[in-house]
Protein backbone atom coordinates (compact mmCIF):
# COMPACT_ATOMS: atom_id res chain seq x y z
CA UNK A 1 0.00 0.00 0.00
CA UNK A 2 1.58 3.31 -1.04
CA UNK A 3 1.90 6.00 1.57
CA UNK A 4 0.82 9.61 1.22
CA UNK A 5 3.94 11.80 1.05
CA UNK A 6 2.23 15.17 1.48
CA UNK A 7 1.42 16.31 5.02
CA UNK A 8 -2.36 16.42 5.46
CA UNK A 9 -3.83 17.69 8.72
CA UNK A 10 -7.40 18.41 9.69
CA UNK A 11 -9.51 20.63 11.88
CA UNK A 12 -12.80 18.93 12.72
CA UNK A 13 -14.81 20.70 15.45
CA UNK A 14 -18.34 19.92 16.57
CA UNK A 15 -20.77 22.83 16.09
CA UNK A 16 -21.75 23.32 19.73
CA UNK A 17 -21.69 26.65 21.55
CA UNK A 18 -19.35 29.51 20.72
CA UNK A 19 -15.78 29.07 19.46
CA UNK A 20 -13.44 28.30 22.38
CA UNK A 21 -9.88 29.67 22.36
CA UNK A 22 -8.57 26.15 22.96
CA UNK A 23 -10.38 24.94 19.87
CA UNK A 24 -9.00 27.85 17.87
CA UNK A 25 -5.48 27.14 19.15
CA UNK A 26 -5.86 23.60 17.75
CA UNK A 27 -6.95 25.04 14.39
CA UNK A 28 -4.00 27.44 14.44
CA UNK A 29 -1.40 24.75 15.12
CA UNK A 30 -2.82 22.55 12.37
CA UNK A 31 -2.85 25.53 9.99
CA UNK A 32 0.71 26.53 10.89
CA UNK A 33 1.99 22.97 10.47
CA UNK A 34 0.33 22.64 7.08
CA UNK A 35 1.76 25.95 5.92
CA UNK A 36 5.23 25.18 7.32
CA UNK A 37 5.44 21.81 5.59
CA UNK A 38 3.75 22.84 2.36
CA UNK A 39 0.93 20.45 3.17
CA UNK A 40 -2.85 20.72 3.21
CA UNK A 41 -5.35 21.64 5.92
CA UNK A 42 -8.73 19.92 5.69
CA UNK A 43 -11.66 21.57 7.49
CA UNK A 44 -14.65 19.34 8.19
CA UNK A 45 -17.52 19.46 10.67
CA UNK A 46 -18.47 16.67 13.07
CA UNK A 47 -22.19 17.30 13.38
CA UNK A 48 -23.71 13.95 14.31
CA UNK A 49 -25.03 15.01 17.73
CA UNK A 50 -28.46 16.36 16.81
CA UNK A 51 -29.24 17.38 20.41
CA UNK A 52 -26.20 19.63 20.77
CA UNK A 53 -25.26 20.71 17.26
CA UNK A 54 -26.67 23.90 15.75
CA UNK A 55 -26.39 25.80 12.48
CA UNK A 56 -25.62 28.93 14.48
CA UNK A 57 -22.56 27.28 16.01
CA UNK A 58 -21.58 25.87 12.62
CA UNK A 59 -21.56 29.36 11.14
CA UNK A 60 -19.74 30.74 14.18
CA UNK A 61 -16.85 28.33 13.62
CA UNK A 62 -16.56 29.44 10.00
CA UNK A 63 -16.76 33.10 11.03
CA UNK A 64 -14.02 32.60 13.63
CA UNK A 65 -11.60 31.11 11.09
CA UNK A 66 -12.36 33.84 8.57
CA UNK A 67 -11.91 36.59 11.16
CA UNK A 68 -8.50 35.17 12.04
CA UNK A 69 -7.57 34.72 8.36
CA UNK A 70 -6.93 31.00 8.90
CA UNK A 71 -7.67 29.68 5.46
CA UNK A 72 -8.05 26.00 4.61
CA UNK A 73 -7.23 24.07 1.47
CA UNK A 74 -10.04 21.56 1.37
CA UNK A 75 -13.38 21.11 3.09
CA UNK A 76 -16.32 23.24 4.14
CA UNK A 77 -17.25 25.90 1.54
CA UNK A 78 -14.16 25.29 -0.63
CA UNK A 79 -14.91 21.66 -1.56
CA UNK A 80 -12.41 19.01 -2.52
CA UNK A 81 -12.03 15.38 -3.62
CA UNK A 82 -13.46 13.88 -0.43
CA UNK A 83 -16.84 15.60 -0.26
CA UNK A 84 -19.06 15.94 1.64
CA UNK A 85 -17.26 17.48 4.62
CA UNK A 86 -20.08 17.33 7.16
CA UNK A 87 -20.46 14.04 8.99
CA UNK A 88 -24.23 14.31 8.93
CA UNK A 89 -24.03 14.00 5.13
CA UNK A 90 -21.71 10.96 5.17
CA UNK A 91 -23.91 8.33 6.85
CA UNK A 92 -23.99 6.07 3.79
CA UNK A 93 -20.19 6.06 3.77
CA UNK A 94 -20.02 5.00 7.42
CA UNK A 95 -22.63 2.28 6.89
CA UNK A 96 -20.57 0.85 4.04
CA UNK A 97 -17.37 0.85 6.12
CA UNK A 98 -19.20 -0.76 9.04
CA UNK A 99 -20.37 -3.59 6.77
CA UNK A 100 -16.79 -4.20 5.66
CA UNK A 101 -15.66 -4.41 9.29
CA UNK A 102 -18.48 -6.83 10.08
CA UNK A 103 -17.54 -9.04 7.14
CA UNK A 104 -13.88 -9.08 8.17
CA UNK A 105 -14.77 -9.99 11.75
CA UNK A 106 -13.10 -6.87 13.12
CA UNK A 107 -16.38 -5.81 14.71
CA UNK A 108 -18.91 -8.07 16.32
CA UNK A 109 -22.41 -7.85 17.83
CA UNK A 110 -22.57 -7.40 21.61
CA UNK A 111 -25.84 -7.98 23.46
CA UNK A 112 -24.74 -7.57 27.09
CA UNK A 113 -26.41 -4.85 29.11
CA UNK A 114 -24.44 -2.65 31.51
CA UNK A 115 -26.13 -4.42 34.41
CA UNK A 116 -25.00 -7.82 33.14
CA UNK A 117 -21.42 -6.63 32.69
CA UNK A 118 -21.32 -5.24 36.22
CA UNK A 119 -22.85 -8.43 37.63
CA UNK A 120 -20.16 -10.55 35.98
CA UNK A 121 -17.41 -8.32 37.37
CA UNK A 122 -18.94 -8.51 40.83
CA UNK A 123 -19.29 -12.30 40.69
CA UNK A 124 -15.60 -12.56 39.77
CA UNK A 125 -14.56 -10.29 42.63
CA UNK A 126 -13.66 -7.40 40.33
CA UNK A 127 -14.61 -3.74 40.48
CA UNK A 128 -18.08 -3.49 38.88
CA UNK A 129 -17.01 -0.22 37.22
CA UNK A 130 -14.16 -1.77 35.24
CA UNK A 131 -16.07 -1.44 31.99
CA UNK A 132 -16.84 -3.93 29.28
CA UNK A 133 -15.41 -7.46 29.78
CA UNK A 134 -15.32 -8.65 26.13
CA UNK A 135 -17.91 -11.33 27.03
CA UNK A 136 -19.77 -11.22 23.71
CA UNK A 137 -16.72 -11.91 21.56
CA UNK A 138 -17.35 -15.64 21.45
CA UNK A 139 -21.11 -16.01 21.69
CA UNK A 140 -22.47 -19.24 20.27
CA UNK A 141 -25.16 -19.25 17.63
CA UNK A 142 -27.57 -20.55 20.26
CA UNK A 143 -26.82 -17.61 22.59
CA UNK A 144 -27.27 -15.12 19.77
CA UNK A 145 -30.57 -16.76 18.80
CA UNK A 146 -31.73 -16.52 22.42
CA UNK A 147 -30.88 -12.81 22.63
CA UNK A 148 -32.73 -12.16 19.39
CA UNK A 149 -35.72 -14.10 20.70
CA UNK A 150 -35.71 -11.75 23.70
CA UNK A 151 -35.93 -8.82 21.31
CA UNK A 152 -32.44 -7.56 21.99
CA UNK A 153 -30.64 -5.47 19.39
CA UNK A 154 -26.83 -5.57 19.59
CA UNK A 155 -24.34 -2.74 19.62
CA UNK A 156 -21.25 -3.29 17.49
CA UNK A 157 -17.82 -3.43 19.11
CA UNK A 158 -14.32 -3.42 17.65
CA UNK A 159 -12.37 -6.57 18.50
CA UNK A 160 -9.17 -5.31 20.15
CA UNK A 161 -6.09 -7.48 19.44
CA UNK A 162 -5.06 -9.79 22.29
CA UNK A 163 -1.74 -9.43 24.12
CA UNK A 164 -0.83 -6.20 22.36
CA UNK A 165 1.34 -3.36 23.62
CA UNK A 166 0.36 -0.20 21.78
CA UNK A 167 3.39 1.93 21.06
CA UNK A 168 3.54 5.18 19.13
CA UNK A 169 5.66 8.29 18.91
CA UNK A 170 3.64 11.31 19.92
CA UNK A 171 4.98 14.45 18.23
CA UNK A 172 4.41 16.46 21.42
CA UNK A 173 4.92 13.88 24.17
CA UNK A 174 7.51 11.53 22.73
CA UNK A 175 7.38 7.74 22.87
CA UNK A 176 4.17 6.37 24.39
CA UNK A 177 3.00 2.86 25.21
CA UNK A 178 -0.20 1.36 26.60
CA UNK A 179 -0.88 -2.26 27.53
CA UNK A 180 -3.74 -3.45 25.35
CA UNK A 181 -5.11 -5.48 28.25
CA UNK A 182 -6.33 -2.22 29.78
CA UNK A 183 -8.32 -1.32 26.66
CA UNK A 184 -11.55 -3.33 26.27
CA UNK A 185 -13.45 -3.82 23.04
CA UNK A 186 -15.36 -0.61 22.41
CA UNK A 187 -18.62 0.35 20.74
CA UNK A 188 -18.43 1.76 17.21
CA UNK A 189 -22.15 1.66 16.34
CA UNK A 190 -25.39 1.74 18.31
CA UNK A 191 -28.00 -0.98 18.18
CA UNK A 192 -29.95 1.02 15.60
CA UNK A 193 -26.88 1.04 13.36
CA UNK A 194 -25.97 4.67 13.99
CA UNK A 195 -22.17 5.01 13.92
CA UNK A 196 -20.45 6.68 16.87
CA UNK A 197 -17.64 9.23 16.99
CA UNK A 198 -15.27 6.37 17.77
CA UNK A 199 -15.86 5.08 14.23
CA UNK A 200 -16.64 8.09 12.09
CA UNK A 201 -13.69 10.25 13.15
CA UNK A 202 -11.02 7.70 12.16
CA UNK A 203 -12.98 6.71 9.04
CA UNK A 204 -13.01 10.33 7.88
CA UNK A 205 -9.30 10.66 8.62
CA UNK A 206 -8.61 7.48 6.66
CA UNK A 207 -10.69 8.39 3.61
CA UNK A 208 -9.36 11.95 3.58
CA UNK A 209 -5.81 10.58 3.81
CA UNK A 210 -4.92 12.53 6.95
CA UNK A 211 -1.26 11.95 7.81
CA UNK A 212 -0.97 13.87 11.09
CA UNK A 213 -3.64 14.10 13.80
CA UNK A 214 -2.95 17.14 15.99
CA UNK A 215 -5.57 17.39 18.73
CA UNK A 216 -6.11 18.17 22.40
CA UNK A 217 -4.60 16.02 25.11
CA UNK A 218 -8.08 15.14 26.39
CA UNK A 219 -8.19 12.66 23.48
CA UNK A 220 -4.86 11.04 24.36
CA UNK A 221 -6.48 8.04 26.20
CA UNK A 222 -8.40 7.12 23.04
CA UNK A 223 -5.23 6.70 20.95
CA UNK A 224 -4.79 2.90 21.44
CA UNK A 225 -8.40 2.33 20.38
CA UNK A 226 -7.94 4.50 17.32
CA UNK A 227 -4.70 2.77 16.35
CA UNK A 228 -6.51 -0.59 16.52
CA UNK A 229 -9.34 0.78 14.39
CA UNK A 230 -6.96 2.29 11.83
CA UNK A 231 -5.22 -1.07 11.53
CA UNK A 232 -8.59 -2.72 10.92
CA UNK A 233 -9.40 -0.08 8.31
CA UNK A 234 -6.11 -0.80 6.57
CA UNK A 235 -6.99 -4.50 6.49
CA UNK A 236 -10.33 -3.85 4.80
CA UNK A 237 -8.83 -1.39 2.29
CA UNK A 238 -10.31 1.82 3.71
CA UNK A 239 -7.13 3.32 5.19
CA UNK A 240 -3.63 3.53 3.75
CA UNK A 241 -1.80 4.01 7.03
CA UNK A 242 -2.06 4.84 10.71
CA UNK A 243 -1.52 8.61 11.08
CA UNK A 244 1.08 10.24 13.28
CA UNK A 245 -0.38 11.72 16.49
CA UNK A 246 0.42 14.88 18.41
CA UNK A 247 -1.55 15.76 21.55
CA UNK A 248 -1.58 19.47 22.35
CA UNK A 249 -1.54 20.70 25.97
CA UNK A 250 -4.61 21.88 27.84
CA UNK A 251 -5.35 25.60 27.99
CA UNK A 252 -5.81 26.45 31.65
CA UNK A 253 -7.72 29.24 33.34
CA UNK A 254 -7.46 30.76 36.80
CA UNK A 255 -6.55 28.43 39.63
CA UNK A 256 -4.92 25.91 37.28
CA UNK A 257 -8.30 24.65 36.14
CA UNK A 258 -8.97 23.77 32.53
CA UNK A 259 -10.41 26.81 30.76
CA UNK A 260 -14.08 25.97 30.42
CA UNK A 261 -16.78 27.41 28.20
CA UNK A 262 -18.18 29.15 31.27
CA UNK A 263 -15.05 31.32 31.54
CA UNK A 264 -15.45 34.60 29.59
CA UNK A 265 -11.81 34.35 28.45
CA UNK A 266 -12.62 31.10 26.64
CA UNK A 267 -14.98 32.80 24.17
CA UNK A 268 -13.07 33.89 21.08
CA UNK A 269 -15.75 36.37 20.09
CA UNK A 270 -15.52 38.12 23.45
CA UNK A 271 -11.93 38.99 22.58
CA UNK A 272 -12.90 40.12 19.08
CA UNK A 273 -15.73 42.26 20.43
CA UNK A 274 -13.40 43.79 23.03
CA UNK A 275 -10.98 44.95 20.37
CA UNK A 276 -8.36 42.24 20.08
CA UNK A 277 -7.09 42.12 16.49
CA UNK A 278 -6.43 38.83 14.64
CA UNK A 279 -2.65 39.26 14.64
CA UNK A 280 -2.57 39.76 18.40
CA UNK A 281 -4.92 36.85 19.03
CA UNK A 282 -2.96 34.44 16.85
CA UNK A 283 0.40 35.51 18.23
CA UNK A 284 -0.83 34.94 21.78
CA UNK A 285 -2.53 31.62 21.05
CA UNK A 286 0.72 30.42 19.45
CA UNK A 287 2.45 30.99 22.78
CA UNK A 288 0.07 28.57 24.51
CA UNK A 289 2.45 25.69 24.04
CA UNK A 290 4.98 27.02 21.53
CA UNK A 291 7.48 29.86 21.29
CA UNK A 292 9.64 31.38 18.59
CA UNK A 293 12.56 31.73 20.99
CA UNK A 294 13.18 32.11 24.71
CA UNK A 295 13.29 35.91 24.51
CA UNK A 296 10.96 36.67 21.60
CA UNK A 297 7.22 36.82 22.22
CA UNK A 298 6.18 39.06 19.35
CA UNK A 299 6.18 37.68 15.83
CA UNK A 300 4.27 37.80 12.57
CA UNK A 301 2.26 34.96 11.09
CA UNK A 302 4.92 34.54 8.43
CA UNK A 303 7.51 34.02 11.17
CA UNK A 304 5.19 31.44 12.73
CA UNK A 305 4.87 29.62 9.41
CA UNK A 306 8.62 29.70 8.83
CA UNK A 307 9.48 28.31 12.26
CA UNK A 308 6.57 26.20 13.53
CA UNK A 309 7.14 22.52 14.21
CA UNK A 310 4.76 20.40 16.27
CA UNK A 311 7.78 18.69 17.80
CA UNK A 312 8.62 22.01 19.50
CA UNK A 313 5.24 22.24 21.27
CA UNK A 314 5.64 21.76 25.00
CA UNK A 315 3.42 19.12 26.63
CA UNK A 316 2.85 21.10 29.83
CA UNK A 317 -0.52 22.84 30.29
CA UNK A 318 -0.54 26.50 29.20
CA UNK A 319 -2.33 29.15 31.27
CA UNK A 320 -4.43 31.77 29.53
CA UNK A 321 -3.29 35.24 30.66
CA UNK A 322 -5.58 38.09 29.61
CA UNK A 323 -3.06 40.81 30.47
CA UNK A 324 -0.38 39.19 28.33
CA UNK A 325 -2.84 38.85 25.46
CA UNK A 326 -3.59 42.57 25.64
CA UNK A 327 0.09 43.49 25.86
CA UNK A 328 0.87 41.42 22.77
CA UNK A 329 -2.16 42.89 21.02
CA UNK A 330 -0.86 46.40 21.75
CA UNK A 331 2.40 45.55 20.00
CA UNK A 332 0.55 44.30 16.94
CA UNK A 333 -1.64 47.40 16.85
CA UNK A 334 1.52 49.53 16.79
CA UNK A 335 2.96 47.34 14.01
CA UNK A 336 0.03 48.07 11.68
CA UNK A 337 0.54 50.49 8.80
CA UNK A 338 -1.34 53.68 9.72
CA UNK A 339 -3.87 53.46 6.90
CA UNK A 340 -4.66 49.85 7.76
CA UNK A 341 -5.02 50.70 11.45
CA UNK A 342 -7.28 53.66 10.68
CA UNK A 343 -9.55 51.52 8.52
CA UNK A 344 -9.79 48.75 11.11
CA UNK A 345 -10.35 51.15 13.99
CA UNK A 346 -13.13 52.98 12.21
CA UNK A 347 -14.89 49.74 11.26
CA UNK A 348 -14.61 48.49 14.84
CA UNK A 349 -15.86 51.69 16.47
CA UNK A 350 -18.79 51.98 14.10
CA UNK A 351 -19.82 48.33 14.55
CA UNK A 352 -19.27 47.89 18.27
CA UNK A 353 -19.29 51.39 19.80
CA UNK A 354 -21.81 53.33 17.75
CA UNK A 355 -19.25 55.76 16.33
CA UNK A 356 -21.05 57.95 13.77
CA UNK A 357 -20.47 56.95 10.16
CA UNK A 358 -20.59 60.60 9.05
CA UNK A 359 -17.64 61.73 11.19
CA UNK A 360 -15.18 63.39 8.75
CA UNK A 361 -12.62 60.92 7.37
CA UNK A 362 -9.71 63.37 7.55
CA UNK A 363 -10.38 64.12 11.20
CA UNK A 364 -10.73 60.44 12.03
CA UNK A 365 -7.42 59.63 10.34
CA UNK A 366 -5.77 62.38 12.41
CA UNK A 367 -7.36 61.03 15.60
CA UNK A 368 -6.39 57.44 14.79
CA UNK A 369 -2.75 58.41 14.44
CA UNK A 370 -2.89 60.03 17.89
CA UNK A 371 -4.14 56.88 19.65
CA UNK A 372 -2.36 54.07 17.78
CA UNK A 373 0.53 53.95 20.24
CA UNK A 374 -1.66 54.58 23.28
CA UNK A 375 -4.05 51.62 23.23
CA UNK A 376 -3.89 47.91 23.98
CA UNK A 377 -7.19 47.04 22.30
CA UNK A 378 -9.34 48.78 19.72
CA UNK A 379 -11.98 49.30 22.39
CA UNK A 380 -9.53 51.46 24.35
CA UNK A 381 -9.78 54.01 21.55
CA UNK A 382 -13.46 54.51 22.26
CA UNK A 383 -12.71 55.96 25.68
CA UNK A 384 -9.98 58.18 24.28
CA UNK A 385 -11.98 59.51 21.32
CA UNK A 386 -15.51 59.61 22.69
CA UNK A 387 -15.16 63.32 23.57
CA UNK A 388 -14.81 64.13 19.87
CA UNK A 389 -18.34 62.97 19.08
CA UNK A 390 -19.96 64.23 22.29
CA UNK A 391 -21.71 67.57 22.05
CA UNK A 392 -20.36 70.40 24.17
CA UNK A 393 -23.56 70.46 26.20
CA UNK A 394 -23.48 66.70 26.85
CA UNK A 395 -19.83 66.47 27.87
CA UNK A 396 -19.55 65.35 31.48
CA UNK A 397 -16.37 65.66 33.48
CA UNK A 398 -14.95 62.65 35.26
CA UNK A 399 -15.51 63.43 38.94
CA UNK A 400 -12.12 62.23 40.12
CA UNK A 401 -10.27 64.01 37.32
CA UNK A 402 -12.19 67.24 37.91
CA UNK A 403 -11.59 67.14 41.65
CA UNK A 404 -7.86 66.74 41.08
CA UNK A 405 -7.37 69.23 38.25
CA UNK A 406 -10.09 71.88 38.61
CA UNK A 407 -9.01 73.45 41.88
CA UNK A 408 -8.72 77.15 42.78
CA UNK A 409 -5.61 77.74 40.68
CA UNK A 410 -7.31 76.19 37.65
CA UNK A 411 -9.57 79.23 37.24
CA UNK A 412 -6.69 81.47 36.22
CA UNK A 413 -5.25 78.80 33.91
CA UNK A 414 -8.59 78.41 32.17
CA UNK A 415 -9.10 82.18 31.81
CA UNK A 416 -5.61 82.70 30.39
CA UNK A 417 -6.06 79.78 27.98
CA UNK A 418 -9.41 81.15 26.82
CA UNK A 419 -7.87 84.55 26.15
CA UNK A 420 -4.92 83.07 24.26
CA UNK A 421 -7.07 80.83 22.11
CA UNK A 422 -9.65 83.54 21.37
CA UNK A 423 -6.85 85.55 19.80
CA UNK A 424 -6.07 82.85 17.22
CA UNK A 425 -7.72 83.45 13.86
CA UNK A 426 -10.33 80.86 12.95
CA UNK A 427 -8.40 79.57 9.96
CA UNK A 428 -5.17 79.23 11.95
CA UNK A 429 -6.52 77.06 14.79
CA UNK A 430 -3.89 74.35 14.27
CA UNK A 431 -1.78 72.25 16.61
CA UNK A 432 1.46 74.22 16.33
CA UNK A 433 -0.26 77.59 16.68
CA UNK A 434 -2.30 76.39 19.68
CA UNK A 435 0.79 74.98 21.36
CA UNK A 436 2.79 78.18 20.85
CA UNK A 437 -0.02 80.38 22.17
CA UNK A 438 -0.54 78.35 25.35
CA UNK A 439 3.10 77.59 26.03
CA UNK A 440 4.26 81.19 25.71
CA UNK A 441 1.80 82.34 28.35
CA UNK A 442 1.30 79.40 30.75
CA UNK A 443 4.77 77.86 30.71
CA UNK A 444 7.18 80.64 29.78
CA UNK A 445 5.51 83.71 31.29
CA UNK A 446 3.59 82.21 34.24
CA UNK A 447 6.29 79.54 34.78
CA UNK A 448 3.79 76.77 35.43
CA UNK A 449 4.75 73.13 35.25
CA UNK A 450 3.20 71.43 32.19
CA UNK A 451 1.08 69.16 34.37
CA UNK A 452 -0.31 72.16 36.26
CA UNK A 453 -0.77 74.19 33.10
CA UNK A 454 -2.38 71.56 30.93
CA UNK A 455 -4.13 69.21 33.37
CA UNK A 456 -7.14 71.47 33.77
CA UNK A 457 -7.33 72.09 30.02
CA UNK A 458 -7.27 68.37 29.25
CA UNK A 459 -10.11 67.62 31.67
CA UNK A 460 -12.07 70.59 30.37
CA UNK A 461 -12.03 69.57 26.71
CA UNK A 462 -12.13 65.75 27.03
CA UNK A 463 -13.82 65.22 30.39
CA UNK A 464 -11.00 62.90 31.47
CA UNK A 465 -7.49 62.99 32.89
CA UNK A 466 -6.23 60.86 30.00
CA UNK A 467 -6.78 61.85 26.38
CA UNK A 468 -4.94 62.08 23.09
CA UNK A 469 -2.31 64.86 22.97
CA UNK A 470 -3.86 68.12 24.14
CA UNK A 471 -3.09 70.53 21.31
CA UNK A 472 -4.02 68.00 18.62
CA UNK A 473 -7.27 67.32 20.49
CA UNK A 474 -8.08 71.02 20.44
CA UNK A 475 -7.47 71.17 16.69
CA UNK A 476 -9.78 68.19 16.18
CA UNK A 477 -12.52 69.81 18.26
CA UNK A 478 -12.12 73.14 16.53
CA UNK A 479 -11.96 76.61 18.03
CA UNK A 480 -15.65 76.97 18.84
CA UNK A 481 -16.01 73.71 20.79
CA UNK A 482 -12.65 74.10 22.51
CA UNK A 483 -13.58 77.53 23.85
CA UNK A 484 -17.08 76.43 24.80
CA UNK A 485 -15.67 73.57 26.89
CA UNK A 486 -13.02 75.71 28.55
CA UNK A 487 -15.66 78.28 29.51
CA UNK A 488 -17.98 75.58 30.84
CA UNK A 489 -15.18 74.10 32.94
CA UNK A 490 -14.32 77.54 34.30
CA UNK A 491 -17.89 77.94 35.48
CA UNK A 492 -17.88 74.47 37.06
CA UNK A 493 -14.75 74.93 39.16
CA UNK A 494 -15.54 75.35 42.85
CA UNK A 495 -13.66 78.64 42.99
CA UNK A 496 -14.89 80.28 39.81
CA UNK A 497 -15.86 83.94 40.32
CA UNK A 498 -19.57 84.58 40.71
CA UNK A 499 -21.34 85.78 37.58
CA UNK A 500 -22.46 89.41 37.72
Curated annotation (Swiss-Prot):
<dbReference type="InterPro" id="IPR000924">
    <property type="entry name" value="Glu/Gln-tRNA-synth"/>
</dbReference>
<keyword id="KW-0648">Protein biosynthesis</keyword>
<dbReference type="InterPro" id="IPR045462">
    <property type="entry name" value="aa-tRNA-synth_I_cd-bd"/>
</dbReference>
<keyword id="KW-0963">Cytoplasm</keyword>
<comment type="subunit">
    <text>Monomer.</text>
</comment>
<dbReference type="InterPro" id="IPR020752">
    <property type="entry name" value="Glu-tRNA-synth_I_codon-bd_sub1"/>
</dbReference>
<dbReference type="GO" id="GO:0005829">
    <property type="term" value="C:cytosol"/>
</dbReference>
<dbReference type="GO" id="GO:0008270">
    <property type="term" value="F:zinc ion binding"/>
</dbReference>
<keyword id="KW-0436">Ligase</keyword>
<keyword id="KW-0030">Aminoacyl-tRNA synthetase</keyword>
<dbReference type="GO" id="GO:0006424">
    <property type="term" value="P:glutamyl-tRNA aminoacylation"/>
</dbReference>
<comment type="function">
    <text>Catalyzes the attachment of glutamate to tRNA(Glu) in a two-step reaction: glutamate is first activated by ATP to form Glu-AMP and then transferred to the acceptor end of tRNA(Glu).</text>
</comment>
<dbReference type="InterPro" id="IPR020058">
    <property type="entry name" value="Glu/Gln-tRNA-synth_Ib_cat-dom"/>
</dbReference>
<dbReference type="InterPro" id="IPR004527">
    <property type="entry name" value="Glu-tRNA-ligase_bac/mito"/>
</dbReference>
<dbReference type="InterPro" id="IPR014729">
    <property type="entry name" value="Rossmann-like_a/b/a_fold"/>
</dbReference>
<comment type="similarity">
    <text>Belongs to the class-I aminoacyl-tRNA synthetase family. Glutamate--tRNA ligase type 1 subfamily.</text>
</comment>
<protein>
    <recommendedName>
        <fullName>Glutamate--tRNA ligase</fullName>
        <ecNumber>6.1.1.17</ecNumber>
    </recommendedName>
</protein>
<dbReference type="Pfam" id="PF00749">
    <property type="entry name" value="tRNA-synt_1c"/>
</dbReference>
<dbReference type="Pfam" id="PF19269">
    <property type="entry name" value="Anticodon_2"/>
</dbReference>
<dbReference type="InterPro" id="IPR008925">
    <property type="entry name" value="aa_tRNA-synth_I_cd-bd_sf"/>
</dbReference>
<keyword id="KW-0067">ATP-binding</keyword>
<dbReference type="GO" id="GO:0000049">
    <property type="term" value="F:tRNA binding"/>
</dbReference>
<feature type="short sequence motif" description="'KMSKS' region">
    <location>
        <begin position="258"/>
        <end position="262"/>
    </location>
</feature>
<dbReference type="InterPro" id="IPR020751">
    <property type="entry name" value="aa-tRNA-synth_I_codon-bd_sub2"/>
</dbReference>
<feature type="binding site">
    <location>
        <position position="261"/>
    </location>
    <ligand>
        <name>ATP</name>
    </ligand>
</feature>
<feature type="short sequence motif" description="'HIGH' region">
    <location>
        <begin position="13"/>
        <end position="23"/>
    </location>
</feature>
<dbReference type="InterPro" id="IPR033910">
    <property type="entry name" value="GluRS_core"/>
</dbReference>
<dbReference type="GO" id="GO:0004818">
    <property type="term" value="F:glutamate-tRNA ligase activity"/>
</dbReference>
<keyword id="KW-0547">Nucleotide-binding</keyword>
<dbReference type="InterPro" id="IPR049940">
    <property type="entry name" value="GluQ/Sye"/>
</dbReference>
<dbReference type="GO" id="GO:0005524">
    <property type="term" value="F:ATP binding"/>
</dbReference>
Amino acid sequence: MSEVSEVRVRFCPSPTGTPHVGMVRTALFNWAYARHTGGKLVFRIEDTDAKRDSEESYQAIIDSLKWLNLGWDEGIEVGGPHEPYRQSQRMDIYADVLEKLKESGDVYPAYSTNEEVQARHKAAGRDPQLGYDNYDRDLTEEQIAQFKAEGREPVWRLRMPDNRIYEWHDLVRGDMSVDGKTVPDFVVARSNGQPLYTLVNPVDDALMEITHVLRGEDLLPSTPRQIALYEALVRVGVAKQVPTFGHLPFVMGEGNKKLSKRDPESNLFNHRDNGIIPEGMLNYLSLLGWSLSADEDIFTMQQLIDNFDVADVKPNPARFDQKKLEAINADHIRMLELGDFTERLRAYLEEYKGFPADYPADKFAFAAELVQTRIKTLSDADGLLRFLITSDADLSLDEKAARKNLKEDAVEVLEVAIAQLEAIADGEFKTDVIEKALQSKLIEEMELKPRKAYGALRVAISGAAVSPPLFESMELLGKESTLARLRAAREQTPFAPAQQ
